[in-house]
């Protein structure tokens, strides 16, 4: 690793199951609990919240959009997995190319993946020729500066590359690293694969990480593609299961989430159970967003948006929205105006019905 060095999703939905403590998987039942003017930031109502049914198409014809990060003015930077482009999307739908990230090797589920902003830096995670890595570039609002590698050596594969990155309230960078199609790596603390990693903005290992000298924050993960912090600083993660259960997990430092020894709720004291689980045909979860005591989880194979009340760190009964209306949903992100932006993902080669004439799109969803 520099600073620090160190899969595939089925297509079908199921219902979450409540638990105590997440992955990507095949078919089963429904989850159980164990373009407008530039928006002005508003004071949101108390949560939990849910979609109002007011959905606007912000922009169309994107090429495999994977992640987005909002700027203060309500516009967003969007990554395209296969083209390696970063594009600026205005709330009124105006689209501008900011630049192309050099060194991206797009194949299978790999390519230009997660994006995050921190101070004057723009961070992205991508698949390179020999590994997955996190880099940063200075961003002046119009163009990208020189690329600096901060984490490298994360195992890559045609599937299970993880890819989501997010800064926590502690100022540290959290990285979802997939198992790169080798489940044994998830239990190997000497490998960064199958983990959630935590590093400083420069890519160094923080002194207070749970394993001395290691970027590993939690382990036993198959393919984490959603990361979000709630108002209390708790970290939530969505994870693809294999053939049985997809998961929503509440992440604790140093804990083992079980893959590949267990999938879903195991009630085994050796592992942390997911907070909720879904059969893989109802979820195949990717990006998640937190808004007012609520987690919103985008479903790829499930082709729906899950709304999950999470008051006090516990999960209520999930509810599905937009089932099949927009196809595969890659990511959900809370906008500065209090709405939710959704990325569709029907141009990624995995859609059962193929892309529609306007795919891929960004949708703006009102919340109440």
Residue ranges: model-predicted function:
Residues 5-18, 22-182, 234-240, 282-312, ...:
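Acidic, Gly/Ser/Thr-rich repeat motifs that build Ca2+-stabilized beta-propeller blades
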Residues 216-243:
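Repeat-solenoid scaffold signature
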Residues 142, 168-174, 198-211, 229-233:
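Secondary-structure boundary elements
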Residues 136-144, 197-206, 251-259, 263, ...:
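Short loop/turn segments immediately following beta-strands, especially the blade-tip
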Residues 96-107, 147-161, 199-218, 255-280, ...:
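Surface-exposed loop and turn segments in beta-propeller and other repeat-based domains
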Residues 1-2:
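Sec-dependent bacterial lipoprotein signal peptides
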């Amino acid at each position: 690793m520099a600073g620090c060095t160190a899969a595939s999703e089925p297509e079908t939905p199921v219902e979450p199951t409540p638990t105590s403590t997440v992955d990507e998987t095949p078919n089963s039942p429904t989850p159980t609990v164990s373009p407008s003017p530039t928006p002005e930031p508003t004071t949101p109502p108390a949560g939990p919240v849910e979609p109002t049914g007011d959905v606007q198409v912000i922009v169309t014809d994107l090429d495999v959009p994977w992640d987005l990060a909002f700027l203060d003015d309500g516009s967003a930077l969007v990554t395209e997995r296969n083209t390696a482009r970063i594009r600026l999307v205005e709330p009124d739908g105006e689209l501008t190319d900011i630049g192309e990230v050099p060194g991206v090797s797009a194949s299978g589920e790999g390519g230009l993946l997660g994006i995050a902003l921190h101070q004057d830096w723009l961070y992205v995670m991508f698949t390179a020729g020999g590994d997955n890595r996190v880099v940063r570039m200075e961003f002046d609002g119009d163009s990208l500066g020189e690329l600096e590698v901060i984490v490298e050596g994360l195992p890559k594969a045609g599937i299970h590359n993880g890819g989501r990155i997010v800064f926590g309230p502690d100022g540290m960078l959290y990285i979802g690293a997939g198992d790169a199609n080798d489940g044994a790596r998830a239990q190997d603390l000497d490998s960064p694969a199958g983990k959630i990693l935590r590093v400083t903005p420069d890519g160094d290992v923080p002194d207070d990480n749970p394993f001395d000298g290691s970027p590993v924050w939690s382990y036993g993960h198959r393919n984490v593609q959603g990361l979000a912090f709630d108002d209390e600083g708790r970290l939530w993660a969505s994870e693809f299961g294999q053939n049985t259960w997809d998961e929503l997990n509440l992440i604790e430092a140093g804990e083992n989430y079980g893959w590949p020894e267990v999938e879903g709720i195991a009630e085994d004291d050796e592992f942390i159970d997911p907070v909720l689980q879904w059969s893989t045909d109802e979820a195949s979860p990717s990006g998640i967003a937190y808004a007012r005591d609520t987690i919103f989880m985008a479903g790829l194979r499930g082709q729906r948006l899950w709304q999950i009340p999470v008051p006090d760190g516990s999960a209520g009964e999930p509810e599905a929205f937009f089932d099949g209306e927009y196809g595969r949903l890659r990511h959900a992100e809370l906008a500065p105006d209090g709405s939710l932006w959704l990325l569709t993902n029907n141009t990624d080669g995995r859609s059962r019905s193929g892309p529609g004439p306007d795919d891929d799109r960004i949708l703006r969803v009102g919340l109440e």
